[in-house]
Amino acid sequence: MNIIKNINLLEKKIKELKKKNKIIGLVPTMGNLHDGHIKLILLAKKNVDIVIVSIFINPMQFEDLLDLKKYPKTFEQDCCILKQEKVEILFCPDVNEMYPLGLKNHTYIDVPKLSKIIEGKVRPGHFIGVTTIVCKLFNLIQPNFSFFGEKDYQQLLIIKKLVKELNYPIKIISLPIIRLKNGLAFSSRNKHLSDLAQQKASYLYQAIKQTCNFIKNNNGKNIKKNIHTSRKYLIKKGFYIDIFNAYDSKTLDPISKDSKNIIIIASVWLGKIRLIDNKKIILRD
């Protein structure tokens, strides 16, 4: 595996690959790799000639410096996983390489509306950090494909919008959420959960599933009442809720009577650990 930390070396490598007409796939990560990342890499391998994984803990997308400091750093372990999966290139720059003028002086990318609602309200500035680093990676790596998980569903829609409106010649491929046996979605933050907390965390997906089943069985009626019941259930189980609501899965607008494509999006806290999850439903006409 070719480990590249320097932008100039990366650009040289990309020029070589482009000359050979190689199809490039990018899997952007912040490290602390788990089964969800591995599934993305395997999906990439089916679609491209060269898989490039980036590892960069992006300070611009953290509104809480303590959260940034606590984010798990497992570089050696990550390298072993990537070598095992036969990834061709790892791009792992440091902060100075990506933001040489510092965060405050750096140009940023802001996707209007979509980045200001739901998670964007709870974490102002977060999506600006995400879209800025994704644009930088797209510009540097020039992938034909880029691969993202559906757990960060709002992020996925924002990136798709960015690609379309900035005319990037990149196809975004998404992977459904990978879960533990108890239903908990794979996340780098799960390592902070004790065994008992991991069991407790599974109540989140249970609540989401129950809500989806209710909406399907009632063909979209009394959704607000059911959302309220699910919120109460989670609070009773010890969760603090930032977000637990139903949205149009194509636009993330609030649902209306005519909504057929619905997604339940949840962002909750279990102690000091933040968990996010979602599930889509399609209602019949």
UniProtKB/Swiss-Prot annotation:
InterPro entries from the UniProt entry: Pantoate_ligase (IPR003721), Pantoate_ligase_C (IPR042176), Rossmann-like_a/b/a_fold (IPR014729)
Cell location: Cytoplasm
Key word Nucleotide-binding present: yes
Annotated SUPFAM superfamilies: Nucleotidylyl transferase
GO terms assigned for molecular function: ATP binding; pantoate-beta-alanine ligase activity
Pathway: Cofactor biosynthesis; (R)-pantothenate biosynthesis; (R)-pantothenate from (R)-pantoate and beta-alanine: step 1/1
UniProt catalytic activity: (R)-pantoate + beta-alanine + ATP = (R)-pantothenate + AMP + diphosphate + H(+)
GO cellular component: cytosol
Disulfide linkage: none
EC id: 6.3.2.1
UniProt binding sites for beta-alanine: 61
Active-site annotation: 37
Residue positions binding (R)-pantoate: 61, 155
Annotated positions binding ATP: 30-37, 149-152, 178, 186-189
Alphabetized UniProt keyword annotations: ATP-binding, Cytoplasm, Ligase, Nucleotide-binding, Pantothenate biosynthesis
Similarity field: Belongs to the pantothenate synthetase family.
Function recorded in the entry: Catalyzes the condensation of pantoate with beta-alanine in an ATP-dependent reaction via a pantoyl-adenylate intermediate.
Subunit structure: Homodimer.
PANTHER family to which the protein is assigned, alphabetical: CYTIDYLATE KINASE/PANTOATE-BETA-ALANINE LIGASE, PANTOATE--BETA-ALANINE LIGASE
Other comment: The reaction proceeds by a bi uni uni bi ping pong mechanism.
Name of the featured protein: Pantothenate synthetase
